[in-house]
Amino acid sequence: MKIYVIWSFYVLATINKQDYLPKLEFIFHKICIMFKSYYKEYEFHIKP
């Protein structure tokens, strides 16, 4: 998870310096949604 986040930040920083912040926010939002759904699944499946 962390590697993906760092990698996407790096790619954004190198490819498009002007669009860096809006895209960063968008990706961060996507990751949050991904992580929340993963956490819900984790709670549902693993916790008794």
Curated annotation (Swiss-Prot):
Highest taxon in the source lineage: Eukaryota
Name listed for the protein in its UniProt record: Putative uncharacterized protein DDB_G0281365
